[in-house]
Amino acid sequence: MNQARDPAVVELRDVRLNFEEKEVLEGVSLRVETLDRLVIMGQSGSGKSTILRLILGILPPTSGGVFFKQFEISRLRRRKLQHIRTQMGMVYQYSALLSSRTVRDNVALPLEELTDKTRAEIDQAVDQKLEMVGMLDVKEQMPSELSGGMRKRISLARALVMEPELILFDEPSAGLDPVISSVIDELIISLTEQSKVTSVIVTHEMDSAFRIGTRMAMLYQGKIIEQGTPEEMKRSENPVVAQFLSGSTEGPILEGSQDAIATK
């Protein structure tokens, strides 16, 4: 007798999404297991960030299901969805810190808005997370006084402050130079492992993708055309994947060929 699988932390089942007459996602299926760091890679505008919005429940799928553990996101009532979102952290492409608030206040905001913790408990949690990302000494400064890499660290502290089960990263290397990008990648790895957090990372930066990911999925023309471990992706015989990873100008991506798509 087959034993039922435990619910994945995140699962997309044959998800389709239309914007007006355009089909953005075409039958996307993904499964993110506990403690995975799943990297979704693909060209700019391919729908990678749209998948994060589906997981957060900001967008409902046209058809198919998006699940967080046993819960189908699009079927949840508003209060239940708000509760589920407290179990998710989000690191935005350009950090999305409030310019009128100090670093400490930015990190404290989710706890102030979504919990009944005391001021002392909030301050303790904020200090702990800022110390984890090496930013405790700038907690009284404003975001405008900090570098892009520092703001990214603070965004990560804010994402961790609710002790989530899942963190979503939208282009974590955006706007960073290669050295700082590597530092942020290593910080993401160490903190997600230390905090035992599952994560989904959207990026088109291949160096970051292969540093961070335990599993990878390639999104192309609205479909997942390949998924596997980083080593499996490197060995892929799919010409779209091979071209994307190599950065070659020769191949089906620029030609717009449909022949290379072989959805798994």
Language model region names:
Residues 64-72:
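Conserved ABC transporter NBD signature motif
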Residues 142-146, 150:
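Conserved ABC ATPase signature
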